[in-house]
Amino acid sequence: MLSFQQFPTVALLWLLGVALRLTILAMPAVVALIRDDLHLSATEIGIVTGLPVALFAIAAVPGALLIARLGVLSALLCGLLITAVGSALRSASGDIATLYATTTLMGLGVAIMQPALPPLVRLWSTGHVGFGTAVYTNGLLVGEILPVAFTAPLLALIGGGWRAGLIVWSLPVLVIAVLVAKCAPRGQPEAPERSRWWPDWSDGPIWQLGLMFGGITSMYFTTNGFLPVYLSSIGRSDMIGSALTALNLGQMPASLLLLAVADRIVRHVWPYVLAGIVALASVGVLVATSGPAIVAASAMLGFCCGGILTLALALPAVLCAPEDVARTSAAVFALSYGCAVLVPIISGAAWDLTGVPRSAFFPIACCALLPLLLAPRINFRGIA
């Protein structure tokens, strides 16, 4: 564990994790209000909610270029400010084109932040990369929960509709940017001189890490997207709320557990393989039953996704040389979020082509196989 004297650094890492998701999850919490106000179609809603994930893939490598040119901390601050401004500007949208543009700006900011965090964790928590990653991943998960849980009572308290809600959830990101600028540890090199930024796409480990991480993100996003309509199709609409809550809150126990043990297990194959096996079994239970076991399986799938997510986020900083962490992280994010865009499309096509609702979960099951197949091939005894 980090020492008590490093608590402010730990707090900053946690807050940065919160900032990664706070503004993104503010949109689903008010999207119904936006739909009614701007008269959005279902396709337009799909595009505006999918834009951030697409930006995570498209802008990850350019984010590594910014890190190489400005340094890790400066690039991170740029990402925070762009995220806060873009998110707040969404509130001024009077039409779908403006909403697309401001959402793209916000997604670009987050896409810059994501590859900056692994090298920052390596700088700020030397020797405890697993713990540092678990800290900011826990913040990320909290950042996913807060807008969903508190937007409705917040809007009832302050009034102002969806526009006020988007502004309110942008303000903490701006505050976090100020705290990082004032309180971030100094005296460490932000980036090596003449730092390389373009990933080495011929490097096998990049593809292994990217596809393994892609399996995790795809399982999570695709299950969130298809579980409600699947339950509705089998006549269990009554379980939608409890199953989604179990899926998303199931990540939190894994994150808390890894705060204690991440440093000890991040370099071992078995956690990834075990989580893959349990995730695969959970998907099987989801499609094979129609009772309360669905909620339990959703919770276990969320636990596995949260656990592998935390460990996989640490791997670039654990396995790569310091000068390669940012560009490797960018490549991993580009590959993983590219998968997260494609797999839901494949799941939807499988359902449409077969007419069988369960078929949408076959690509999700294939994603669960990726940790099983790829983790044993990764050299976990790489650079410390």
Positions of PLM-derived features:
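Helix-to-loop junctions at the C-terminal end of transmembrane segments
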Residues: 59-71, 254-267, 351
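Extracytoplasmic gate region of multi-pass secondary transporters
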Residues: 27-28, 205-255, 259
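C-terminal transmembrane helical hairpin of 12-TM major facilitator-type secondary transporters
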Residues: 266-315
